[in-house]
UniProtKB/Swiss-Prot annotation:
Part of the 30S ribosomal subunit. Forms a loose heterodimer with protein S19. Forms two bridges to the 50S subunit in the 70S ribosome. This is Small ribosomal subunit protein uS13. The lineage of its organism: Bacteria, Bacillati, Actinomycetota, Actinomycetes, Bifidobacteriales. Pfam families: Ribosomal_S13. GO terms for molecular function: rRNA binding; structural constituent of ribosome; tRNA binding. Transmembrane segments: none annotated. Keywords: Ribonucleoprotein, Ribosomal protein, RNA-binding, rRNA-binding, tRNA-binding. Located at the top of the head of the 30S subunit, it contacts several helices of the 16S rRNA. In the 70S ribosome it contacts the 23S rRNA (bridge B1a) and protein L5 of the 50S subunit (bridge B1b), connecting the 2 subunits; these bridges are implicated in subunit movement. Contacts the tRNAs in the A and P-sites.
């Protein structure tokens, strides 16, 4: 397995798909990278030369934030929003959806499993 940006890239896949294993690189960015470096998107990772791997690594590191740097930046943005107490920060703090989604129903992924709340007791006569 080849390593790019600290990630093991699968040997049997086409390089266009294999690059998407790197956090911060999707299909579009993979295509742009391959076009800029002049590498065919149809070539398999196992068929890449060391020179091509070095070219890819250098291009990705020079032009994009990927893996650890990107994760740190995202975490810092969330921490900043929480600290300045903006609406999105409040939603992050409470563990609720941040971008205006409804919460009366759905939002179970963000809110976690249902917690049953006791209803009103029947009044005895």
């Amino acid at each position: 397995m080849a390593r790019l940006a600290g990630v093991d890239i699968p040997n049997e896949k086409r390089i266009e798909i294999a690059l998407t294993y790197i956090f911060g690189v999707g299909r579009t960015r993979a295509k742009e990278t391959l076009a800029a470096t002049g590498i065919s998107p149809d070539i398999r990772v196992k068929d890449l030369t060391d020179e091509q791997l070095i070219t890819l690594r250098d291009y990705l590191e020079a032009n994009y934030k990927i893996e650890g740097d990107l994760r740190r930046e995202i975490d810092a943005d969330i921490r900043r929003k929480i600290q300045i107490n903006c609406y999105q920060g409040q939603r992050h703090r409470k563990g609720l959806p941040v971008r205006g989604q409804r919460t009366k129903t759905n939002a179970r992924t963000r809110k976690g499993p249902k917690r049953t709340v006791a209803g009103k007791k029947k009044a005895t006569k």
